[in-house]
Amino acid sequence: MTETINTAAQFPSFEKPTVQFNEKGWGPCELPDTFKDVPYQPFSKNDRLGKICDWTNTSNNDKKYQNKYASSFGTGNQYSYYHEEDETTFHLVDTARVQKPPHQRGRFRNMRNSRSGRGRNARGGLNTHGMTTLSGKNVKARDPRHGRGMGKKFGHRGPPPKMRESSVAVRADWASIEEMDFPRLIKLSLPNIKEGVDIVTCGTLEYYDKTYDRINVKNEKPLQKIDRIVHTVTTTDDPVIRRLSKTVGNVFATDAILATIMCSTRSNYSWDIVIEKVGDKIFMDKRDHTEFDLLTVNESSVEPPTDDDSSCNSPRNLAIEATFINHNFSQQVLKTGDQEPKFKFEESNPFISEDEDIQVASVGYRYKKWELGSDIVLVARCEHDGVLQTPSGEAQFMTIKALNEWDSKLANGVEWRQKLDTQRGAVLANELRNNACKLAKWTVQAVLAGSDQLKLGYVSRINPRDHSRHVILGTQQFKPHEFATQINLSMDNAWGILRCIIDLVMKQKDGKYLIMKDPNKPIIRLYDIPDNTFDSDDSDDGEGDDEGFQQVYNYAHNKI
């Protein structure tokens, strides 16, 4: 008997599904109820769908790349992740604080380091020279305060920076020819400039007193007020340059004017130089009755002096004080007297006549020339302040300058009476930071003159509140070329800046021009000015042109 096998019961049946036909596009015409209201976005398996949370460190790097977790397959952003700050718990808090004077800022810094276990020479602590040391290459990356654009002025509630005034008021009839920014000037270079050749030597020098080399903090010496005439004659008023301009050279200047131009990239204060072009000759002059010959104080400091003019610590009064100290120090350290030997050059002082019976400062003048290429011959008057006789009997010429301490607490400086004998390098490094332009100009003047030594004196106030009495705390000497290397002063760059300005003026027509450093920007501008500008009979002279120096001390502009 054969049994009938029911194949339909043993195998599942296949039901034909209903397929919707979409005449207008791809995909089904209707969505099932289970997939309704569900967002859809095209995606790729390479997309990053999430991020590991880090609750221990808040970083600002994601703000720059907010779309790095977005889909790279489509244009939708349904599932994109954005790192946003939670502002639900944000409240305004008064963070204003009283502005402390400069000498009180950071007074507990060492105490905080000691409490946190960061002592001297420890990791991240202070070394023996008082400088903070940070180990590791990515220290700034681990500190959120060092983020880009963060931490520099965070929480700053101080007054806005004071705008400096221009050295001369720019008039409406002045035409601006060229603007030279410092980044461009720093890249200039004019190598292989040989040493200047002497043309004429004038004046009389006194010998240096070596007893001043033994002065220290414990054996200080008062600074004397010496009544001597110091001539600061500009280029066109120099009778020797007038004589030489007929036969030698086509660019004429003084060492002070050249040093100002060569070190212009280190200057912050405004200054100006008048240039007159006559045919193929250029004469660089300073204006009369200006502050060009005053020595700046803390010009390159982080917090330069900004007191009112009535204060003895105002920028102008400090400059007059520094000039007063520098002139007196350069004469006090010399052996004076009728019986003392003197070094005489070929010609006498060109700024005094034979019948004049006056006390003239010890200054030797060298009129030198340099070949700058392209038929440009520079003639300049350089100066020596003294002469030193070596044991072999050879005469070494000196450039003598003085650094002055006015108030170390207000100047954020180093206390000289505590550090000068034991850490003189730290004192000099601090002065290089605060007076970079002034020291660079002194070095350039010594190099141009061919001085064998650059003698620096350290002069301080007896009382920080008394700006009329000073003491000498020590001296230090350098070779000008070696000191230029120490302060990162490139003479090739200095010659390049000077040559750039000479070339610009040579391209102009005959007339009068003015170079001015912008008081608030690192820019030098060249102006074309009328020929009668700054003349003595010009009643509409610039602001402050007819104003002499303030009589803070009992000496005139050219008298110590």
From Swiss-Prot:
Positions carrying Phosphothreonine: T128
Region annotated RNA gate sits at 291-305
Instruction: State its role.
Output: mRNA cap-binding component of the eukaryotic translation initiation factor 3 (eIF-3) complex, which is involved in protein synthesis of a specialized repertoire of mRNAs and, together with other initiation factors, stimulates binding of mRNA and methionyl-tRNAi to the 40S ribosome. The eIF-3 complex specifically targets and initiates translation of a subset of mRNAs involved in cell proliferation. In the eIF-3 complex, eif3d specifically recognizes and binds the 7-methylguanosine cap of a subset of mRNAs.
Q: Please cite one Gene Ontology biological process associated with this protein.
A: regulation of translational initiation
Q: Tell me the InterPro entries matching this sequence.
A: eIF3d
Does the entry feature the keyword Lipid biosynthesis, yes or no? no
| Biased composition, class Basic residues, residue ranges | 100-121, 147-156
Which lineage ranks, top first, belong to the organism behind this chain? Eukaryota, Metazoa, Ecdysozoa, Arthropoda, Hexapoda
For region Disordered, the annotated ranges are 98-166
The record describes its quaternary structure and partners as: Component of the eukaryotic translation initiation factor 3 (eIF-3) complex. The eIF-3 complex interacts with pix.
| Location of the protein in the cell | Cytoplasm
Which keywords does the record carry? Cytoplasm, Initiation factor, Phosphoprotein, Protein biosynthesis, RNA-binding
UniProt lists the gene as: eIF3d1
Does Cytoplasm show up as a keyword for this record? yes
UniProt-listed PANTHER family: EUKARYOTIC TRANSLATION INITIATION FACTOR 3 SUBUNIT 7, EUKARYOTIC TRANSLATION INITIATION FACTOR 3 SUBUNIT D
Gene Ontology MF, one: mRNA cap binding
One Pfam family from the record: eIF-3_zeta
Tree of life domain: Eukaryota
Name of the protein in its database record: Eukaryotic translation initiation factor 3 subunit D-1
Task: Write out the similarity annotation.
Answer: Belongs to the eIF-3 subunit D family.
Query: What information about domains appears in the record's comments?
Result: The RNA gate region regulates mRNA cap recognition to prevent promiscuous mRNA-binding before assembly of eif3d into the full eukaryotic translation initiation factor 3 (eIF-3) complex.
Q: Output the Gene Ontology cellular-component terms.
A: eukaryotic 43S preinitiation complex; eukaryotic 48S preinitiation complex; eukaryotic translation initiation factor 3 complex; nucleus
